[in-house]
Amino acid sequence: MDKKILVSKSISKKFDERLILDNINFEMHSGEILGLLGPSGIGKTTLLNILVGTEKQTQGEIINFHNSKIGYVFQEDRLFEWLSLFENVKIVSENIDEKIIWENLSLVGLKDYYNYFPKELSGGMRQRGSIARALTFAANILLFDEPFKSLDVKLRFELLDLMKKLKKEKNISILFVTHDIEEALYACDRILIMKGQPAKISKEINISNSRIDHKLSIEKEVELKREI
């Protein structure tokens, strides 16, 4: 899991001469869930937009070691209401083998709902659909921008389990943005703490062993709360 797949190198971003992101450095590894934890409005979404190329950094470099496509799971599912679930997944890659679409729908537990329209799906199912769509577009790297925040606790943790399943079964690298410490501890292997104005990565916390040791898990939670 230590193979680098994506690196942010000295990334800074200004809006109208106001510095928003300041010297952001981190690396993503193959087959890990990397958490990005910080308060709302600090610049986490801006950083994700830079990673996928929809915004340009003021300075610094993004290194994508395999020139991999990057899939994006937004806060809102952004499914097209006039398309079926199958069509929503297919639209990101019209020439793709439909077998892959079926595999991804099955992976997220929606194979039997392929002909449903978004209005017929629950909030959790719609987000599963958006995950299937992101998977179909990009098989190696996914960015999750707080996509579970509007869901109840049960659904949130079902989708966190799905995220861990993608890592385990497909070796997918995931950058998971959240402001929820409990979610981060439950799902992530490492957590980056973003804070300050302008925003910086203040600390990296490795928590992959804390799930085995209950005492260590409590210590990590205390450490995270202190950092935030």
Where are the regions that the model predicts?
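Helix-to-loop junction immediately C-terminal to a conserved catalytic motif
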Residues: V52
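Hydrophobic anchor residue at the start of the ABC signature
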Residues: I131
